[in-house]
Amino acid sequence: MKGSAFAIILGLVVLCACSFAEDEQDQFASPNELLRSMFLESRHELIPEVEGRYCQKWMWTCDSERKCCEGYVCELWCKYNLG
């Protein structure tokens, strides 16, 4: 009884995983399309500053050249300053 229940559950898990993998392949035909969609979706996160440069918002990596936007603090990536 335990063996058949395990086999049924395992079969359902494999079926769901295969179905999910097919959906992901249909959504992006190539790695370039994936990168392009990531860039286009995140483009609105960049906000122009007065100096003509762009500041980084939350979850963008930051360093001495890529500054965080006002109200954010750089801790490997930009985080909202709570205090």
Swiss-Prot record:
One of its GO terms (cellular component) is extracellular region. It is found in: Secreted. One of its GO terms (molecular function) is potassium channel regulator activity. Residues 22-53 form a propeptide. Disulfide bonds join C55-C69, C62-C74, C68-C78. Keywords: Amidation, Disulfide bond, Ion channel impairing toxin, Knottin, Neurotoxin, Potassium channel impairing toxin, Secreted, Signal, Toxin, Voltage-gated potassium channel impairing toxin. Coiled coil: none annotated. Expressed by the venom gland. Its main location: secreted. Residues 1-21 form the signal peptide. Negative results: does not inhibit Kv1.1/KCNA1, Kv1.2/KCNA2, Kv1.3/KCNA3, Kv1.4/KCNA4 and Kv3.1/KCNC1 potassium channels. Inhibits voltage-gated potassium channels of the subtype Kv4.1/KCND1 with high affinity and shows weak effects on Kv4.2/KCND2 and Kv2.1/KCNB1 subtypes. The toxin modifies the gating behavior of the channel and may interact with the S3-S4 extracellular loop. This is Kappa-theraphotoxin-Cg2a. It comes from Chilobrachys guangxiensis (Chinese earth tiger tarantula).
